[in-house]
């Protein structure tokens, strides 16, 4: 079978810095026509967005989709709440995670899959400051090792 083509439109890189990602889910999203056109043009921001479960439905908050230039009266509010489309089983699992202390739902990616806009929703646990410092130290040590190894190979 042919591999499904996925075009990533937006990523929330800050989420990987601020949270431990436990599990990810793929969700559809309810949008209007002008929002889809704006997303296809890449005018979307996931930076401060989060999801919440209300009345056994999942909603996405603070995802900024810039108004479509040619949308006129059909443009919606850029920061409006958007409903996510998940199976009942997945929603029940998310409810179980979110009721535990310290867990939250964060969108990590927004992409097109077979012409449909999808959101990768992550169950995340917040990092403490020392966890962030530890990650930075680990990354620096790795780059230092690679630099040292490269110098050794070149004979410097």
Curated annotation (Swiss-Prot):
Keywords: Cytoplasm, RNA-binding. GO terms for molecular function: RNA binding. GO terms for biological process: trans-translation. The keyword Heme does not apply. It is found in: Cytoplasm. It comes from the Bacteria. CDD domains: SmpB (cd09294). Pfam families: SmpB. Transmembrane segments: none annotated. Belongs to the SmpB family. Required for rescue of stalled ribosomes mediated by trans-translation. Binds to transfer-messenger RNA (tmRNA), required for stable association of tmRNA with ribosomes. tmRNA and SmpB together mimic tRNA shape, replacing the anticodon stem-loop with SmpB. tmRNA is encoded by the ssrA gene; the 2 termini fold to resemble tRNA(Ala) and it encodes a 'tag peptide', a short internal open reading frame. During trans-translation Ala-aminoacylated tmRNA acts like a tRNA, entering the A-site of stalled ribosomes, displacing the stalled mRNA. This is SsrA-binding protein. It comes from Thermoanaerobacter pseudethanolicus (strain ATCC 33223 / 39E) (Clostridium thermohydrosulfuricum).
């Amino acid at each position: 079978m042919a591999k499904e083509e996925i075009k990533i439109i937006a990523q929330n890189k800050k989420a990987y810095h601020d949270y431990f990602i436990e599990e990810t889910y793929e969700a559809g999203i309810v949008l209007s026509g002008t929002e889809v056109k704006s997303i296809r043009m890449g005018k979307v921001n996931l930076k401060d967005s989060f999801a919440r479960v209300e009345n056994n439905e999942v909603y996405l908050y603070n995802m900024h989709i810039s108004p479509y230039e040619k949308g006129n009266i059909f443009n919606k509010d850029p920061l409006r709440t958007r409903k996510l489309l998940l199976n009942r089983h997945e929603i029940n699992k998310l409810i179980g995670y979110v009721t535990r202390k310290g867990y939250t739902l964060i969108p990590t990616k927004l992409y097109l899959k077979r012409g449909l806009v999808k959101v990768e929703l992550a169950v995340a646990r917040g990092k403490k400051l020392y966890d962030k410092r530890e990650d930075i130290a680990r990354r620096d040590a790795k780059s230092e090792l690679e630099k040292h190894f490269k110098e050794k190979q070149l004979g410097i």
